């Protein structure tokens, strides 16, 4: 697979569609909070875990921490992904209007937003028990490095699925203070669920990814012999 080529972005593709948009609204788009359904990919499995581990009756404060934690974590993932791909996204129809790709926000602002989001997630992690806290720490490098996987790994969506699967491990252990066989079964189901969801999502970028020279599970399934 050839290395990703990153030519100078076409000005016609990087002109913002929202030139008068307030900075706050641009940051909301950077965080993907204008598309809340995407946050559910991480939140739903995490809530599965906390409710199953607590036999349907988890402490409400813990549920709140899990919900806020998934929002903060998904925000980190989205911003870091856009920072990695700021020179690739302008070449993709679906992503060319993202704030960093369209230059509606600077890289410096993107880094600040990523750090603030990560700090918010860290503050919430301190509420958890030691096992859950260290699982949070272990998830960070996977989340930060996932966007680079599409440059070297044929199925980068699997890396994202593993990263989001940490939500199950963290939530379950936050209730039980351990990880048991059912935890791993739920984790495996979550990885497969996320992989399937994100592969369908990647189908719309398949031709752009092939042209640019980046990997995706959508392309992998096309070239994989049956």
Task: Label every PLM stretch briefly.
Residues 24, 64, 116, 184, ...:
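Alpha-helical membrane-protein architecture signal
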Residues 25-38, 104, 150, 216-226:
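Membrane interfacial helix-start motif at the N-side
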Residues 46-84, 94, 118-122, 133-144, ...:
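Membrane-embedded alpha-helical segments that form the functional core of polytopic membrane enzymes
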Residues 40-49, 160-173, 220-223:
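Small-residue-rich segments of transmembrane alpha-helices in multi-pass membrane proteins
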Residues 1-11:
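Arg/Gly-rich low-complexity intrinsically disordered repeat tracts
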Residues 9-29:
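Transit-peptide-like, low-complexity N-terminal presequences
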